[in-house]
Amino acid sequence: MDGTIKEALSVVSDDQSLFDSAYGAAAHLPKADMTASGSPDYGQPHKINPLPPQQEWINQPVRVNVKREYDHMNGSRESPVDCSVSKCSKLVGGGESNPMNYNSYMDEKNGPPPPNMTTNERRVIVPADPTLWTQEHVRQWLEWAIKEYSLMEIDTSFFQNMDGKELCKMNKEDFLRATTLYNTEVLLSHLSYLRESSLLAYNTTSHTDQSSRLSVKEDPSYDSVRRGAWGNNMNSGLNKSPPLGGAQTISKNTEQRPQPDPYQILGPTSSRLANPGSGQIQLWQFLLELLSDSANASCITWEGTNGEFKMTDPDEVARRWGERKSKPNMNYDKLSRALRYYYDKNIMTKVHGKRYAYKFDFHGIAQALQPHPTESSMYKYPSDISYMPSYHAHQQKVNFVPPHPSSMPVTSSSFFGAASQYWTSPTGGIYPNPNVPRHPNTHVPSHLGSYY
């Protein structure tokens, strides 16, 4: 037993790291001390495993992954799915990338990158829209799909000299000629996903750009026009400048906006006002009658929706008015003189600066059509007062003027005072006889009734 232990110790004693305390202490020193070439406490420097380079290689994929997510959030035009072969080989396989990775292709094509250029920046950028791919993009996508989904039995020569447009035109049968059914479904699904993502991104971006352009053009347009007008007043030399884009945008929007039909808006009102009822039709009502029907636009038509109209054929309008009134000698001169009568009535006005153009005042027409009281009715109310005829009638019947007036019988001498002082007229003795019947609606005040 003791011989076995001694033999084991003799074998292990060759490794001084198990017994030498100085060696163990040196193992716990910082990395900077472990790389010092002059330290005599632990063996030769070439026996130490170079840990710092390995640590840098481990941290590199993490840095690439974070930068990749940041680029995708900022609307990168790369494919929505990360097609980096070098990333997949390092993260999944954990080893060095094979000769078909994108980094080797980029190094061969453009030479070594700058020292401050990261792995993510060295990646080849593939357009998000597969229809824009070149032959090289198709080759890169195919290599990425083979390694990403572990696809086998794919004839890569079938996709040589094929760009993105030809690739998108391929159907399921075309893919089956180059690979198996499983690989065909995988490739078609990923290709369809890329196309849908690119269309959605394009529509969203175009809508956002269009709305931003509209908001930028609509808001400053008035301000730009106002500044241009102010500048023209201050400096006449600015008149030579080209027209502003904002003003052109406003004019185009105004022209493109559909104008309302005046016959639909003013038609019902014209028909209602043109109906004279049982009386004779007037000239302004006759014009409204013509304007209520768009078939008469050859001789008279509306000019907008504010009541303005124009006689396109004034002689025809005068002729029709003469037929209606049985006046064959009617012409436009007589018609225009008749229209002047309505200026003071606030029924219509003449539009200045335009020939044969007039404008109806519908508010004035509504006031003109309201019934006004006549002069006889204004003086009917005083004659209808009830106490006037009854007063004169009762004066004859009751005999308000007796031959010998007497004093008013009151209970208090301070209420009216002396009768002769208050009633100075001979009618001071009102109702001297208490047996006289009282008549309603007389001029006697109500507060005197309690004394009789």
Curated annotation (Swiss-Prot):
Changing R337W: In BDPLT21; loss of function in positive regulation of DNA-templated transcription. Residues 112-198 form the PNT domain. One of its GO terms (cellular component) is nucleoplasm. Keywords: Activator, Chromosomal rearrangement, Disease variant, DNA-binding, Nucleus, Phosphoprotein, Proto-oncogene, Transcription, Transcription regulation. The modification Phosphoserine is found at S39. It is linked to Ewing sarcoma: A highly malignant, metastatic, primitive small round cell tumor of bone and soft tissue that affects children and adolescents. It belongs to the Ewing sarcoma family of tumors, a group of morphologically heterogeneous neoplasms that share the same cytogenetic features. They are considered neural tumors derived from cells of the neural crest. Ewing sarcoma represents the less differentiated form of the tumors. Sequence-specific transcriptional activator. Recognizes the DNA sequence 5'-C[CA]GGAAGT-3'. This is Friend leukemia integration 1 transcription factor. It comes from Homo sapiens. The gene is FLI1.
